[in-house]
Amino acid sequence: MFDVIVIGGGHAGVEASAAAARMGKKTLLLTTLIEQIGAASCNPAIGGLAKGHLVKELDAMGGLMGEITDEAGIQFRILNESKGVAVQGSRAQIDMDKYRIIARNKLLKLPNLEISQEQASVLIVENDEVKGVKTNLENIYFAKKVILTTGTFLNGLIHVGENKLQAGRVGELASVNLGNYLQTLGLKMGRLKTGTCPRVDAKSIDFSVLEIQDGDVNPKAFSFRSRNFNPTQLPCYIARTNTTTHEIIKNNFYRAPLFTGQIEGVGPRYCPSIEDKINRFSDKESHHLFIEPQTIDATEYYINGFSTSLPYEVQTQMLRSVKGFENAKITRFGYAIEYDYIEPTELKHTLELKKIKNLYCAGQINGTTGYEEAAAQGFMAGINASLSIDMKEPLILRRDEAYIGVLIDDLVVKGTKEPYRMFTSRAEFRLLLREENAILRLGKYGYDLGLLSEQDFTYIQNIANNLQKGLEFLLSKEFTPNNQNNAFLESLGEDKISSIVNLQKIVARASFDIEKLKKLDPIFETMDHYSLREILNEAKYYHYISMQKAQVEKMKNLSELKIPENFDFKSVSGLSNEVVEKLNHHKPPTIFAASQISGITPAALDILQIYIKMQKKKV
């Protein structure tokens, strides 16, 4: 008898099984190929805009993805560095082979975790409660909780031209039996599609005509726990399609599964295939291609931006029309894959299914796309399954606390009909949710769950104390326009002042940096770089942050008014049938969650608030 069974060893499965095992739960991970645990099925990179936030938040609570990325990374960059700190994003190219090996070894070393190379065929469900799993080897495993992290494997169907192949990804069997079984549980399900790009033999590329894209000179680690971070970095390259490339693709539209009706699933809006780009943006004469090394040996390159399901011979033809790729030899062809997913409105915020007790879902099965989105969900599912076993309150991150909170809330409340990916624009309070303050926002959760060490949490507390002390000093200390103070400002290369201001206003200047902050007062001289950076950020955006915090307080009032789990919305007089129907379907846990449901009017929310408050007074 296991406490937790995790089905699927992708990025969601890695985080789910690790979290559960580290929280003391006897855990079993079932995966089709142990060698493929933590595999990067698509591009060899972790992070990016908003995705980097998810990785940092995982790391802040004790997740694995950040540490693995730092160990396996072969190029590190900060995206949007010229823009505000709220929308900057960390991204790393990874050695995809090394990443898998590190992920697998981390799991194999965990005391409470067993791994078995089997494919789940059927769930054992009694009275709408999951009890265990039956596998393709006829083994039966019982568990208190089961977490589905099946990725693209549920009835996975690969498309290349007119050819179709049942598979979860190239070389691995699709999960047909489990996919068909889930259809019998009365869950709302759909079909989605994603795709991958060709990989090319490095020897066949003429790099001399490509634009070089180097990593950052001073690379920054994803994990705050990474020590002595000094990675060996490789360059990426940029190529461009041309009108010849586009003509080849257009001439083969009739063979594209995307256009022939062969593919029925909905694809990712923000990561279209090259044939979809040429069709939708026919006025464009060129599209960027990012040429990314797959491993530190750089023997094979991933052609990012060239996702396709066109026939093999067409892929070669169109790639060879690109400058630098005239003699390109494709080692692995691109393909599209369709798969089943469960509509995420079927889930609670804990990622447990509403209809099947003790059954949790995380990753692409919930309609998301991306390694980072999957890992974040897997981590939270593993945590909440473990907390539920211990009969403790679940961990549900609010929208103002974390991008992970935004991700899960969007899925559960709004649902999705297309692969969902995270953007900074999805977060209302993104100035509060900066990458670099993730440990300050979420570190205590990780420590309380036993996923962060005493040493890690002490480090976080020291930064928090420095931030509070430094910001209070800047806000309380007045700077008068006398000769001494103005001379000091001029020595820093700053403009003089003509009226009394507090130091926060001076530090808020665009030209004011960390080196100047150190010279401002002895209080800052001994502080570490992390603390100084956060003091600087908080000072520069102080008024905007204050406004967002005021908005958060209003939201908290709604969030703290909880709706009982089995609440009878029909009992509330004054609610329309449409509102009752939507509330019964979504089962929002709070008034704020109810406010996010399309069609729930302010008047309905007022009625509901009054009714719930009256009921609480009666108790």
From Swiss-Prot:
Keyword Transcription: no
Species annotation: Campylobacter jejuni (strain RM1221)
Annotated PROSITE patterns: GIDA_1 (PS01280), GIDA_2 (PS01281)
A Gene Ontology molecular function term of the record: flavin adenine dinucleotide binding
GO biological process: tRNA methylation; tRNA wobble uridine modification
Obligatory cofactor(s): FAD
UniProt-annotated location(s): Cytoplasm
Official protein name in the record: tRNA uridine 5-carboxymethylaminomethyl modification enzyme MnmG
Positions bound to NAD(+): 267-281
Organism lineage string: Bacteria, Pseudomonadati, Campylobacterota, Epsilonproteobacteria, Campylobacterales
